[in-house]
Regions:
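Divalent metal-coordination and catalytic microenvironments
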Residues: 6, 21, 26, 48, ...
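Short, acidic/polar
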Residues: 73-83, 137-149, 196-203
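Histidine-rich, glycine-flanked metal-binding segment
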Residues: 1-2, 7-54
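His/Asp/Glu-enriched, well-ordered alpha-helical/loop segment
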Residues: 256-339
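C-terminal cap of metal-dependent C-N hydrolases
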Residues: 6, 329-383
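Active-site core of metal-dependent hydrolases
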Residues: 158-281
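Mid-domain alpha/beta scaffold segments of enzyme catalytic cores
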Residues: 91-145
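Metal-associated gating/positioning segment near the N- to mid-region
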Residues: 46-112
């Protein structure tokens, strides 16, 4: 397949120009200014569209199907495939829904059955995000978490701590200990902000370079002084290597934090959704909606794409993802920038007006088309030869019958 005439944005390879992208055997075969159409079995005209690596959503909750009510290792999570491909996402990272005890069930129930690539931060709590148990420090076992992470090193990208309400640093310290043992980063949702454990100490003292603070524009984060200036300690934390992730979610993104911070140069290292049942139909909506917010807050498109592809891939130490290098898995998003009058809502119900909005035209996962909004990879019905339909004795109810007949 040849994606021809699109504007390629690939941060790893420093491409921001019109290029053709050739896909063969599930891999990127070539990226070049003009690849002859005669070489391709199928040519897809993507002129006027943006061709990017498949998006990497570094914070989602997809441990669905367990039946646990009110839990992110259960009913609060969503199955990934219904939310990813339609927005150009080919990789999601579950942010600690499962813990070191129930990760094998998550792998069997969701990861191994999904067409989306699913990676995971492993919760320091053995039962994962299962409600009250997240406060049980006896469940926070660094050694068990590290052992599980090393056992599934190809899937588990880091350790997660979240929702802890106690005054002690126990959750953070044990997560960091597990991360050190397994040589992987830690992602922190700081839970209830307590004066006994100041946020400044989290990002200046407790987290290591390469560790991730998510929900960076949460209202509780001490971000602005009385005159609206970004507090200097945040820039200091970034200089020492702490990563700041969006993690929009259903209650963790405030324009009154994000807009002033963006204007003063404190934007996100990575853009992510915190997808779950409480965010999917609210202000967050989906990955492209979150990316569009940053586009309308003044972040250039190539930077928006970078922070949704190559940057998160590096943060989780999966540098085979988030790029269109020759030989890489052919995970590709083809995006359109719609021009018009749009509104974007934060988690407190406040609106930002904007003039540009991202929409996904096409998603390719491992070389296979998995989303095609307007049928740009298809032939017009009246130009096809005879094909089977309902009522034909050979029709089996799927397109597979026609494909087999043609072969």
């Amino acid at each position: 397949m040849l994606l021809k005439g699109g504007h390629v944005i690939d941060g790893k390879n420093h491409i921001n120009a019109v290029r053709d992208v050739a896909v063969a055997d599930g891999r990127i075969a070539a990226v070049s200014p003009d690849i002859p159409a005669a070489k391709a079995a199928k040519v897809v005209d993507v002129s006027g569209l943006y061709v990017t690596p498949g998006l990497v959503d570094m914070h989602a909750h997809v441990y669905a199907g367990t039946g646990q009510r009110g839990a992110y290792c259960g009913d609060n999570s969503v199955y990934p495939d219904g939310f990813t491909f339609r927005t150009g996402v080919t990789t999601v990272v579950d942010a600690g829904s499962s813990g070191w005890r129930n990760f094998p069930d998550f792998k069997d129930r969701v990861i191994d059955r999904s067409h989306t690539r699913v990676l995971a931060f492993l919760n320091i709590v053995g039962a994962g995000m299962a409600g009250k148990v997240e406060q049980d420090v006896e469940q926070m076992d660094p050694k068990a978490a590290a052992e599980q992470a090393m056992r599934y090193r190809d899937i588990i990208v880091g350790i997660k701590t979240a929702h802890y309400a106690g005054p002690e640093w126990t959750a953070v310290e044990r997560a960091v200990e597990a991360g050190t043992l397994a040589n992987i980063p830690v992602m922190v949702d700081f839970g209830t902000f307590r004066p006994e454990r100041p946020f400044q100490d989290l990002v200046l003292k407790k987290l290591r370079p390469g560790d991730i603070y998510t929900h960076m524009y949460l209202s509780w984060v001490p971000m602005l002084d009385d005159s609206g200036r970004v507090l200097p300690y945040l820039f200091e934390a970034r200089r020492r290597g702490v990563i700041f992730d969006v993690g929009h979610g259903g209650g963790s993104f405030l324009f009154r934090q994000a807009v002033p911070a963006m204007r003063q140069g404190f934007g996100p290292d990575s853009i992510s959704t915190d997808l779950h049942i409480g965010s999917m139909n609210a202000g967050m909506k989906d990955m492209l909606n979150v990316m569009s917010k940053f586009l309308n807050m003044g972040m250039p498109l190539d930077e928006v794409i970078l922070r949704s592809t190559w940057t998160p891939a590096r943060e989780i130490k999966h540098e085979e993802l988030g790029n269109l290098s020759v030989g890489a898995a052919a995970d590709v998003a083809v995006l359109r920038v719609e021009e018009g009058h749009f509104g974007f809502v934060d988690t407190y119900g406040a609106r930002l007006r904007g003039t540009r909005k991202l929409e996904c035209e096409l998603t390719v996962r491992n070389g296979r088309v998995v989303w095609d909004l307007n049928g740009i990879t298809r032939e017009d019905w009246d130009k096809l030869g005879k094909y089977l339909a309902q009522g034909d004795g050979k029709w089996d109810g799927t397109l597979g019958a026609e494909i087999r007949r043609r072969k």
